[in-house]
Every structure is written in C-alpha cells, then in structure tokens.
C-alpha cells in the first residue's frame, strides 16, 4: 500500500487521547532466505509531491550473486500508475562520502531517472538531515556481540530527510517541476568495498 489514510489515537500513561490523521505506508518483506545473505545494500524511498506518489528502490546484491543491481520504481499521478517498468530506470548518486558514525558511503543526492520514449521523469532526493544511524551490532548483547564481531557483522541502517524534486520532460522540454519534503533510507548489510 504506497499511500493510505491513517487515523491514529495515542494515549500515553493513561493521559488524554491524542488524535492524528495523515498518510500511511505499509510494506512487507517476503522471501524464504534472509535478506542479509542476498543483499549488500539498498536505497529505498517513498514520497508524495502534489498529485504524484513515488516508491523507489535500488538494490545491490551480494558479491556471490555478481553484485547485480535491481531498480524498483513506481510513479503514480492522481492514483493512476504512470511509470513502473524497472528497465526504464537509471539510478545515480552524487557527492558520495563516508558517513563517520557508521563508516558507510552515503550519497548527498540520490537520483532516479525514468525514460519512456519522449517522456522523462527525474526524481532527485537531496539529503538535508540524518534522522537515524543504527549499527546492527549495537542492538546485540552478551555472547551475541562477541559472535557478531567474530563473523565481522558490519551492517547499518540510515534514514534521511530532505527535499524531493520531480522534473517532467517531454521531448527534452521541461514541462513540470514539483518539490516537497521526503524520507528515504540506506540499508547497508555488507562490508564497504575498499579500493
């Protein structure tokens, strides 16, 4: 469900209930093997800009699977899917630097470009704030920490907020530009490749 209506009531420690409404998102991981064994890293994002809704991901497989990449992309306008063919997606990153807390390479900009004949959409996520750095080993305790260190567990999860811009081109003519805030993540199971 890329976008649904959310109605939430929260009461903390028996206090007065607080009521909130907004948009909600739900996804589900599926498969019969651990993602840790299959995936090296991925960028994942969702966003809403005016009448557009976006879900985008770029997955890199582990080295034993050839480090192959898999884009996932869906762009809808007014609830109707207008772009969802992964073979038409080009993914790129700008200003990649090592994030000091996790040691993972993080892009300042993540760009998904969707080209379908004369139609082209460019969606650019520009990182403004890191809202979460989670090193997986820090969630472990006791003997599990020792085992994780022996196995060289090095995974991290990072979440960012910033601006999402959408540019729509027809035959190389810019016909529409939209901007809004967005949330996206980098899940980095694997080790950073040293050059």
Set out the residue ranges of the language-model regions:
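Structured soluble/peripheral alpha/beta segments that form catalytic or ligand/cofactor-binding pockets
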Residues: 1-195
């Amino acid at each position: 469900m890329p976008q649904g209506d959310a109605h939430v009531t929260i009461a903390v420690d028996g206090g007065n209930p607080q009521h909130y409404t907004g948009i909600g998102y739900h996804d589900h991981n599926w498969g019969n093997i651990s993602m840790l064994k299959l995936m090296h890293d991925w960028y994942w994002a969702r966003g809403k800009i005016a009448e557009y809704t976006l879900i985008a991901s770029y997955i890199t497989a582990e080295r034993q699977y050839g480090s192959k990449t898999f884009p996932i992309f869906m762009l809808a306008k007014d609830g109707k899917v207008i772009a969802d063919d992964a073979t038409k997606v080009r993914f790129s990153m700008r200003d990649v630097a090592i994030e000091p807390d996790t040691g993972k390479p993080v892009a300042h900009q993540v760009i998904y470009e969707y080209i379908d004949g004369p139609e082209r959409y460019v969606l650019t996520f520009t990182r403004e704030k890191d809202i979460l750095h989670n090193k997986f080993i820090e969630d472990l305790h006791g003997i599990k920490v020792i085992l994780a260190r022996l196995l060289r567990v090095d995974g991290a999860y990072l979440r960012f907020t910033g601006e999402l811009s959408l540019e729509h081109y027809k035959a190389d003519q810019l016909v529409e530009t939209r901007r809004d805030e967005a949330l996206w993540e980098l899940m980095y199971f694997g080790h950073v490749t040293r050059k």
